[in-house]
Regions:
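Hydrophobic transmembrane alpha-helices and their helix-loop junctions in integral membrane proteins
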Residues: 1-200
Length: 200
């Protein structure tokens, strides 16, 4: 109710939405402002990567849901189609970038950007469907929230696994870590389980 009493003009809503997009888009991170995340994960210790992936990235998604949806509804509807295209680019293009990585932490970091693309896709589908199909909009919002929760759990588990591998081999490169299943079969099973969950 408080948000609806603001009586913002469309131009004011658009400016506020752009400010939210800059702040929350960098925090999620959205393509093309995602470049800080892989370097942050590579430089961070395992515990830092776990906290960053499981909690801190979700702040951007929470901010979009909590503030953008109620405050900038009209501007969000206006820009939703463009943001859906950006989200789809993030999902497809960044998945190929992740596939090319040799460092395991960078691989998971880039896959996180692609997964957050699904979150922004769900949020902006809500804007796109408001008024025309409310049940589909609710499904989009629920999907975005479930994706944030599942990504937080799965990526945190993968960064823990990479930390264990690094502790034993002193390398995060894929080429240096062949044959782990021979020495740690249960751990390898768990890591494959989390990798399959990460793939969707």
């Amino acid at each position: 109710d408080v948000y609806k009493r603001q009586d913002l003009s469309f131009k004011e809503e658009l400016l506020i939405l752009l400010a939210f997009l800059i702040g929350f888009g960098i925090k999620i991170p959205m393509w093309p402002v995602h470049t800080w995340l892989p370097d942050a994960h590579v430089e961070a210790p395992t515990s830092g990567s776990v906290i960053l992936a499981s909690v801190l990235l979700k702040v951007g998604g929470y901010g979009m849901i909590r503030f953008m949806l109620p405050i900038t509804t009209e501007a969000g509807i206006y820009l939703s189609e463009y943001m859906i295209y950006l989200s789809l680019i993030a999902i497809i293009y960044i998945s190929f970038v992740a596939y090319a990585q040799e460092d395991m932490k960078k691989l998971i970091a880039y896959s996180s950007v692609a997964h957050m693309g699904f979150v922004t896709l769900g949020i902006f589908l809500v804007f796109n469907l408001l008024g025309s199909n409310s049940s589909a909009a609710i499904i989009g919002l629920e999907g975005a929230m479930i994706q944030m929760i599942s990504h937080g759990l799965i990526s945190a588990a993968l960064f823990f696994c990479i930390g264990i591998v690094y502790k034993h081999s002193k390398s995060r490169l894929l080429k240096d870590n062949y044959g782990v299943a021979k020495f740690m079969p249960i751990f390898s099973f768990m890591m494959i389980f989390f990798l399959m969950a990460n793939s969707g």
